[in-house]
Curated annotation (Swiss-Prot):
This is Protein YIPF5. Residues 75-106 are annotated as: Interaction with Sec23. Residues 146, 195-196 are lumenal. GO terms for biological process: endoplasmic reticulum to Golgi vesicle-mediated transport; Golgi organization; insulin processing; protein transport; regulation of ER to Golgi vesicle-mediated transport; vesicle fusion with Golgi apparatus. It comes from Rattus norvegicus. Interacts with the COPII coat components Sec23 (SEC23A and/or SEC23B) and Sec24 (SEC24A and/or SEC24B). Interacts with YIF1A. May interact with RAB1A. Interacts with YIPF3 and YIPF4. The chain crosses the membrane at residues 125-145, 147-167, 174-194, 197-217, 237-257. It is found in: Endoplasmic reticulum membrane; Golgi apparatus, cis-Golgi network membrane; Cytoplasmic vesicle, COPII-coated vesicle.
């Protein structure tokens, strides 16, 4: 046993002392150690993950105000989300499809049936003018003591549906329902003149019959001419004008009686 004690005492003989450990200090957070110089730009999270310096977020400086935190990034602008400014957006009327220049050109085409019509303009779906003309037609009937708004809208819907089916069977290119409703609505303008005459005098005499026949021919001729120019239906104007005359004849009967 004495030999074993001597061996242990010789094995553990070092220059290390516990008293020296208490006197020695280690600076892990400061800049005194060798590791602080080499890894000063790195950050170690609580879970022990290494974060490179280029991925570190800039620290916010304290402003001294509790309810007003410091903004690390500038606030986003509306241009960031939408891409373009509000000044570059199209006008509201253009987004709704309302073009007063085209409305005026279509109105002049109806008022001048012998004038050459532009098929590209008439092929557009524009319901702003037809709605206004339907309201004006109902208003003039109301001035004559006839409350026929329901009949006007009902006959208009049925007539547009019938012409839509007929034109799709007759034309090679086909036509949309909006285009048919737009053309028939614009060609209702002469019928507003007939209902306005009915406010002043009666249309049940010979003069009224001649005026009614003229207005029906005017409306049907304008509508058929626009349809054949927009759909390239040369030589079929009479075939298109006949159903148009039947439709506008119903509106004329409402105005006369």
């Amino acid at each position: 046993m004495s030999g074993f004690d001597n061996l242990n005492s010789g094995f553990y003989q070092t220059s290390y002392s516990i008293d020296e450990q208490s006197q020695q200090s280690y600076d892990y957070g400061g800049s005194g150690g060798p590791y602080s110089k080499q890894y000063a730009g790195c950050e170690y999270s609580q879970q022990g993950r290494f974060v490179p310096p280029d991925m570190m977020q800039p620290q916010q400086t304290y402003t001294g105000q509790i309810y007003q935190p410091t903004q690390a990034y500038p606030p986003p602008t509306p241009q960031t989300f939408y891409g373009d400014s509000f000044e570059e957006e199209p006008p509201l009327l253009e987004e709704l499809g309302i073009n007063f220049d085209h409305i005026w050109q279509k109105t002049l085409t109806v008022l001048h049936p012998l004038r050459a019509s532009d098929g590209s303009i008439m092929n557009e779906t524009d319901l702003a003018g037809p709605v206004v003309f339907c309201l004006a037609f109902g208003a003039t009937l109301l001035l004559a003591g006839k409350i026929q708004f329901g009949y006007v809208y009902g006959i208009s819907a049925i007539g547009c549906l019938g012409m839509f089916c007929l034109l799709n069977l007759m034309s090679m290119t086909g036509v949309s329902f909006g285009c048919v409703a737009s053309v028939l609505g614009y060609c209702l303008l002469p019928m507003i003149l007939l209902s306005s005459f009915a406010v002043v005098f009666s249309l049940q005499g010979m003069v009224g019959i001649l005026l009614t026949a003229t207005i029906i021919g005017w409306c049907s001729f304008s509508a058929s001419k626009i349809f054949i120019s927009a759909l390239a239906m040369d030589g079929q104007q009479l075939l298109v004008a006949y159903p148009c005359a039947l439709l506008y004849g119903v509106f004329a009967l409402i105005s006369v009686f």
